[in-house]
From Swiss-Prot:
Residues 1-46 are annotated as: Disordered. GO terms for molecular function: structural constituent of ribosome. Belongs to the bacterial ribosomal protein bL34 family. Keywords: Ribonucleoprotein, Ribosomal protein. Signal peptide: none annotated. GO terms for biological process: translation. Residues 12-24, 32-46 have a biased composition (Basic residues). This is Large ribosomal subunit protein bL34. The gene is rpmH. Pfam families: Ribosomal_L34. It comes from Stenotrophomonas maltophilia (strain R551-3). GO terms for cellular component: ribonucleoprotein complex; ribosome. It comes from the Bacteria. Residues 1-11 have a biased composition (Polar residues).
């Protein structure tokens, strides 16, 4: 039996799990965004 690939892309899940609004919902998510801003990331979230 062959094992399936683990990455099954879905834009909906991508945004829901890693999007800007998902990050803003939690305190830790906001920490992630502030770290990425401090680092100078062009893209903050998915």
């Amino acid at each position: 039996m062959a094992t399936k690939r683990t990455f099954q892309p879905s834009n909906l899940k991508r945004k829901r799990d890693h999007g800007f609004r998902a990050r803003m919902k939690t305190a830790d998510g906001r920490k992630i965004l502030s770290r990425r801003r401090a680092k100078g990331r062009k893209v903050l979230s998915a």
